[in-house]
């Protein structure tokens, strides 16, 4: 009886240690990514702060233009952020939003759609369309403050991506 109990004890101990190691590895990888993003923010803080409003405006304009088609050119988000003149981008956004302000619910919704479009850009077209439909439904279920918070977080992460 003692041998099986001892064997069971060692099996459980081994499994426990293995689970702890796997948990530590997962935490380490996540912490490493977070540390890298923090380093990027600190190293490029000024650039990051300047890039955030550009990314936000680009996201809003991108989705607004898809829906309202004020500019006949189908711009890529990457081009809006990195190559389009910032004054022109702001003018295009104002034209697209019309009577809606940049702080409006409409603008925030466009911003979220633009941000998620970029996050899902790597997916095949059909899958991307399906996911964007889910995003639209999720946006409708969020409160105004939750949408603003989500948009801010998304734009911050996008800006980090452009710094990499």
Feature-to-residue mapping (PLM):
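Bacterial N-terminal signal peptides
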Residues: 7-15
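Mitochondrial intermembrane space
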Residues: 20-164
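Positively charged n-region of N-terminal signal peptides that target proteins for export
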Residues: 1-4
């Amino acid at each position: 009886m003692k041998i099986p109990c001892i064997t069971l004890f060692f099996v459980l101990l081994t499994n426990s240690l293995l689970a702890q190691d796997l948990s530590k590895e997962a935490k380490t990888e996540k912490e490493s990514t977070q540390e890298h993003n923090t380093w990027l923010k600190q190293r490029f803080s000024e650039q990051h702060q300047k890039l955030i409003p550009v990314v936000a405006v680009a996201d809003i304009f991108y989705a607004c233009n898809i829906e309202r088609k004020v500019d006949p050119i189908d711009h890529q988000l990457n081009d809006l952020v990195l190559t389009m003149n910032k004054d022109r981008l702001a003018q295009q956004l104002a034209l697209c939003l019309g009577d809606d302000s940049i702080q409006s619910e409409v603008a925030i919704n466009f911003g979220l759609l633009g941000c998620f479009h970029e996050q899902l850009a790597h997916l095949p077209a059909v899958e991307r369309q399906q996911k964007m439909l889910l995003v639209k439904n999720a946006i409708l279920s969020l409160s105004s403050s939750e949408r603003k918070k989500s948009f801010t977080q998304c734009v911050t992460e996008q800006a980090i991506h452009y710094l990499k």
